[in-house]
Amino acid sequence: MAKKKAFIPLLCLTSIVFLPWCISFTFKKSLESWITHWYNTKESEIFLNTIQEKSILKKFLEFEELFLLDEMLKEYPETRLQNLRIEIYKETIQLIQTNNQDHIHTILHFCTNIICFLILSVYSIRGNQELIILNSWVQEFLYNLSDTIKAFSILFLIEFCVGYHSTGGWELMIGSVYKDFGFIPNDHIISFLVSILPAILDTIFKYWIFRYLNRVSPSLVLIYDSIPFQE
């Protein structure tokens, strides 16, 4: 009976975590060939954002400069110049194909994220019973922990999310979200989000600690306050 009681919340957690990913991954694989064919055969202007334009232009200029430098050093005849034009043409085709693949992956990532969001939304609306079971299991698990372990876990979570060393992690996470949804990365917006999101989370954590925990477990708040290396 105890094993069955522990298995049900674990099954609910597994379904919430892996079900959206499995469905979106299957959808992505099934649409990949169709989107690739559609993107490579459609007759429309290629859209490049500023970052992509600079990246492709930089690669092309570097490639061209290398061949021109080679020509200046070797001073080969016209046949060598003809080979140079052919190589530049091949490199241009390669850059276009690479750019197309980047756009295809952006479209697929965007569709995958939308599908995951829709699945989680439906799950939160229709899966009330599973969420109630999971919530009760989490509360029971936390209740059985000692106050010292709870205080240590809270402090570790706060330092991990809003500590002075968490800036790099926030930049990486926000940049990944930008790339997944196909947005143009903006250093000013990313810097603003990196500075404001940890402050918001820090405020929420402290409000939760001194509002909720002070009522539920005063001893836990005392242990947290007694830790000398907290901010």
UniProtKB/Swiss-Prot annotation:
Query: Does the keyword Transmembrane belong to this entry?
Result: yes
Task: List UniProt keywords, sorted A-Z.
Answer: Antiport, Chloroplast, Hydrogen ion transport, Ion transport, Membrane, Plastid, Plastid inner membrane, Potassium, Potassium transport, Transmembrane, Transmembrane helix, Transport
Membrane topology qualifier: Multi-pass membrane protein
Location(s), subcellular: Plastid, Chloroplast inner membrane
| Chain ranges passing through the membrane | 7-27, 104-124, 154-174, 189-209
Gene Ontology, cellular component aspect: chloroplast inner membrane
Reaction(s) catalysed by this chain, per the record, are: K(+)(in) + H(+)(out) = K(+)(out) + H(+)(in)
- A single Gene Ontology molecular function, please? proton transmembrane transporter activity
User: What is one Gene Ontology biological process annotated in the Swiss-Prot or TrEMBL record?
Assistant: potassium ion transport
Name the source's superkingdom: Eukaryota
Q: What does this protein do?
A: Contributes to K(+)/H(+) antiport activity by supporting proton efflux to control proton extrusion and homeostasis in chloroplasts in a light-dependent manner to modulate photosynthesis. Prevents excessive induction of non-photochemical quenching (NPQ) under continuous-light conditions. Indirectly promotes efficient inorganic carbon uptake into chloroplasts.
The similarity annotation says:
Belongs to the CemA family.
Instruction: Report the protein name in the record.
Output: Potassium/proton antiporter CemA
Origin species, per record, is Pisum sativum
Q: What is the lineage of its organism?
A: Eukaryota, Viridiplantae, Streptophyta, Embryophyta, Tracheophyta
